[in-house]
């Protein structure tokens, strides 16, 4: 809208993300700042105690709780991006999750594109922002985004020319595209780890030996080569390779024999008394295939029965 973008915009935006009553999904992205977690959890209420301040319009000072080599990488996550304070407060309070500031005609940003229209569950259209600082290098006049829930449908739309870009390729198609050397396929490193979270408040998952047995019984190499098939690499530690300044000292092995030993030490020499486990996964054919494969691995390696349940995410 022509307003200057300043360091103070970032300070206010980060305060908003950390405001407890907003209920932000990713406040922990900023927990590396001094006092950020305490502010978000209500231990302190004065944001000036948090390790971020604007020294002038173009200088931001950040104080971290400890050396964080990947901090600059974290700032590429959208939860850390600035929002326009005046627009947010024009249509509500700092913690208003239903404010109209995100609607077309109201939304103000500092990016190369502006929000033009938003048809819920149909289409989002953004148009070139003439006030963007580097607008002359923005080649596109508009971009259209379509929410497609089925990845196979999305892949067919891409091949039919209805989409110019898709970030999701069905695993069974990705393997074929890789073998063919399809020039439309591009695989880039992704800073993320695919994992299941165990409910440690229920038996027998409250037993660490049971949890270790479950993870040792998963053949990650097979998962990436035979199931996902799109360039993923086995996750032998929680932090993915490529994280600046981090190299895991140990790796999680695939060791069914050790898994069975740990299960016996946990009191399950026979799995007849082991309760049926449930894997809850978000609706997607690829997620279903991974869940099915892990279900089979746990059954074959440990004799454990597993039920699968999907839910929209």
Labelled PLM ranges:
Residues 1-26, 61, 157, 204:
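Aromatic- and charge-enriched surface segment that lines or borders ligand/interaction sites
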Residues 2-4, 9, 152-162, 179-180, ...:
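Short helices/loops that flank or line small-molecule/ion binding pockets
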Residues 116-127, 144-202, 221, 225:
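Extracellular/periplasmic solute-recognition and catalytic clefts
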Residues 36, 47-48, 57-58, 63-142, ...:
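Gly/Pro-rich hinge or "lid" segments in bacterial periplasmic/extracellular proteins
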Residues 127-128, 206-300, 307:
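Append "and occasionally in soluble cytosolic enzymes with long acidic Gly/Pro-rich linkers
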Residues 10-13, 60-61, 111-114, 124-125, ...:
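Short, well-ordered beta-strand elements
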Residues 2, 164-165, 184, 299-313:
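Periplasmic binding protein-like
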Residues 10-14, 62, 143, 210-223:
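Bilobed periplasmic-binding protein/Venus flytrap-like ligand-binding cleft at the lobe interface
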């Amino acid at each position: 809208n022509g307003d200057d973008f300043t360091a103070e915009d970032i300070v206010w935006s980060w305060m908003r993300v950390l405001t407890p009553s907003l209920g932000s999904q990713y406040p922990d992205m900023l927990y590396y700042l001094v006092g950020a977690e305490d502010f978000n959890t209500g231990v302190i209420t004065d944001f000036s105690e948090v390790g971020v301040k604007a020294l002038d319009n173009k200088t931001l000072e950040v104080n971290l709780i400890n050396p964080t080599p990947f901090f600059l990488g974290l700032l590429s996550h959208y939860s850390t991006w600035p929002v326009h304070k005046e627009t947010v407060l024009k249509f509500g309070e700092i913690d208003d999750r239903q404010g109209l500031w995100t609607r077309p005609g109201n939304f103000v940003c500092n990016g190369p594109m502006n929000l033009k229209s938003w048809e819920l569950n149909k289409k989002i259209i953004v148009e070139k922002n003439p006030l963007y600082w580097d607008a002359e290098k923005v080649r596109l006049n508009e971009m259209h985004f379509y929410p497609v829930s089925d990845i196979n449908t999305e892949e067919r739309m891409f091949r039919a020319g209805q989409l110019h870009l898709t970030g999701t390729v069905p695993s069974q198609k990705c393997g074929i595209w890789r073998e063919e050397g399809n020039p439309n396929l591009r695989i880039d490193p992704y800073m993320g780890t695919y994992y299941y979270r165990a409910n440690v408040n229920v038996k027998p998952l409250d037993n660490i030996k049971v949890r270790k047995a479950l993870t040792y019984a998963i053949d990650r190499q097979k998962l990436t080569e035979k199931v996902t098939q799109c360039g993923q690499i086995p996750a032998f530690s929680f932090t993915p390779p490529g994280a600046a300044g981090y190299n895991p000292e140990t790796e999680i092995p695939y060791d069914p024999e050790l898994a069975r030993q740990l299960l016996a030490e946990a009191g399950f020499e026979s799995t007849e008394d082991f309760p049926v486990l449930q894997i809850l996964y978000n609706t997607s054919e690829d997620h279903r295939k991974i869940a099915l494969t892990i279900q089979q691995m746990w059954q074959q390696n440990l004799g454990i029965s597993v039920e699968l349940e999907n839910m929209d995410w």
